[in-house]
Regions:
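Homeobox/homeodomain signature
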Residues: 37-39, 89, 123, 131, ...
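Intrinsically disordered, low-complexity boundary segments flanking structured domains
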Residues: 28-36, 117-119, 169-174
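A short linear-motif detector with a strong N-terminal bias
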Residues: 24-29, 40-44, 57-60, 74, ...
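Hydrophobic, proline/glycine-rich low-complexity stretches
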Residues: 1-60, 152
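Acidic/His-leaning functional-site neighborhoods
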Residues: 135-212
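Arginine residue identity/basic-tract feature
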Residues: 2-4, 19, 23, 29, ...
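Catalytic strand-loop segment that frames the active site of acyl-thioester-processing enzymes
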Residues: 1-23, 98-159, 173
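HotDog/MaoC-like acyl-thioester-processing domains
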Residues: 40-125, 192-194, 199-228
Length: 228
């Protein structure tokens, strides 16, 4: 993976990491309030982010983010999540999500006690670009994001796409791939299961500023991140 390495002040890095985690959770909590689309899957996500903390920005979700369906079809909808019009001078970040209806209906499983599996570090080691997520990490994320999507429940659960995306964005920011104001497109290409190891790599195409997340065992592409 070819990246631009930059040395950051540790205090600044911690502040930006904290801000990004909170900001992404704000978007994802807002999306979870959208009713009538339980079991639908994320196709693509477009993010407009400012990686630098803003003066006076201390509160978690200090502005109200509202999901708005901007395009609707039988098997797909496009949702924009942004601040109210009167708050856009202060808060201009937003997220657009394409939700796709699965070919087969998803049954909501009965509530069951999830086994606490061994913890696998979320961001891998500092020496490689390996990531993996345990079932307990998934459960913690679902609580934080208020995510009740049935495809993330039960023994056959797939990992929340945003959990995987968030970890990738944090890793890429630490490596200097993104800074300042950034517009990104994230494509979700295949589902990922708990404990499945994946790694980050570049597109391998000259002039294409894209990063892919692939499974270690088969090299299957899970998602792509492109700077717009």
């Amino acid at each position: 993976m070819r990246v631009r390495f930059t040395i950051y002040n540790e205090e600044v890095e911690n502040t930006v990491n904290d801000r990004l985690k909170k900001k992404l959770l704000c978007f994802e909590r807002a999306l979870s309030t959208l009713e009538g689309y339980e079991g639908w899957m994320i196709g693509t996500t477009t993010l407009h982010l400012d990686w630098q903390p803003k003066q006076g920005e201390n509160e978690f979700c200090h502005t109200k983010l509202t999901p708005e369906i901007i395009k609707k079809g039988r098997s797909a909808i496009r949702v924009r999540i942004a601040a109210a019009e009167e708050e856009k001078e202060w808060e201009n970040e937003e997220m657009e999500v394409l939700l796709v209806k699965p070919r087969q209906s998803v049954l909501v499983p009965e509530k069951e006690k999830m086994p606490l599996m061994k913890t696998i570090t979320e961001l891998g080691s500092e020496d490689d670009d390996t990531l993996a997520f345990s079932r307990s990490q998934m459960e913690e994320y679902l609580r934080e994001a208020a995510d009740t999507n049935p495809i993330h429940q039960g023994e056959a659960a797939v990992l929340p796409g945003f959990l995987v995306m968030n970890a990738c964005l944090l890793r890429l920011w630490k490596k200097g791939w993104m800074k300042g104001q950034t517009a990104l497109e994230v494509r979700f290409l295949a589902p990922l299961r708990p404990d499945e190891e994946v790694y980050l790599s570049d597109s391998g195409q000259e002039g294409r500023n894209a990063v892919y997340l692939r499974t270690k065992q088969e090299g299957k592409e899970i998602l792509s991140i492109t700077e717009k």
